[in-house]
Amino acid sequence: MVDPLSEAEKSKVTFASLGLSEPLLKAVEEQQYTRPYPIQRDAIPPILRGKDILGIAKTGSGKTASFVLPILELFHRTKTVGSRYASVLVLVPTRELASQVADVFQQLGVHLFPKVKTVAVYGGVSINPQMQAVHGADIIVATPGRLLDLLDQNALRLSDVEILVLDEADKMLALGFADEMNQLVDRLPKNRQTILFSATLGDAIDEINKSLLRTPVTIEVVEEATNLELIEQVAYNVDPTRKGPLLRYLIKTEQMQQVLVFASSTRTADNLVVKLTKNGIQAAAIHGQKGQQVRTDVLHKFKAGKLQVMVATDLLARGIDIQLLPYVINFDLPRSPKDYVHRIGRTGRAEATGKAISLITPDDEHHFKIIQKKMGKRVEQIDTTDLDLQGY
């Protein structure tokens, strides 16, 4: 385990005090990271010392930057870039996460010189461009299946890998990637640094820990409850036929420039986008029936602030991590109170305030009462019967 710090010591930790160089500190500031999350504070120093890591942390805890920053720092210190084969391999369970992790490497490494080349490889798209892209890559972020495909095509080799990151290892196992992970690990050099992150610590993860990690530093970040005090919550009681107009009314009257809208189905998501667009609101949907490239493009535009509204289903939204998101709207309520807190926790992060809005039909009333009870917080409900939605 890492040595515990006093609360006073924790409050004094900065990205500079963690040992990061000026180019990375500049990128951190540009990405509006104010101070290190607990997982970053505890993981960055031992990773820089070459230690193996067993990190127990959930999505949204800041774990991606906790390994991206020290890996980039090591490249900056050694200047060993541009080799024929990658020296860092990051394995992830999904295409969305592969794309996001690669984005974080690129965003935080923007000021490094020489440049560090990061490539994301995943299924669902043509393998041919990826076969070209991995040539000369310093960092490869990959889903296990596509990486094996590339190895079978002799597009790359893993003999130069010095750092292996297993991100969301529990999810990779849950998705049935155990055999692929074992095949890949067998092709890696034995003398390497291994960093494993998992949301949970079960028997399967414990087995991986024993077989892959060498005297690891164990970091367990107790899931910080979503800081509901930073999130302004409000609900609007509305007739089902008026939900669409009310959504458009709220986006326009509150002048929302970046809002994540949750819908219960792909059909609802697509219908919302059509009607939002007709009303002059820039919107796009992200869900399982969209192609991978479309989903990636939508997410990139939304994160960059070039898309006003992103409509998502729960399934596709789980891996989405967006800094300083000001608005979340539940067009449809989620099935469970836990999912509700997870959704609204997309805003109110990094000590920034946010607003979460829910549209409640008469059929939702009982369910919303249960959500409030489980959350331990009463949400103001506003009646919209007399609200003039003509023209929306």
Where in this protein do the model-derived segments appear?
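Conserved helicase RecA-like core
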Residues: 3-392
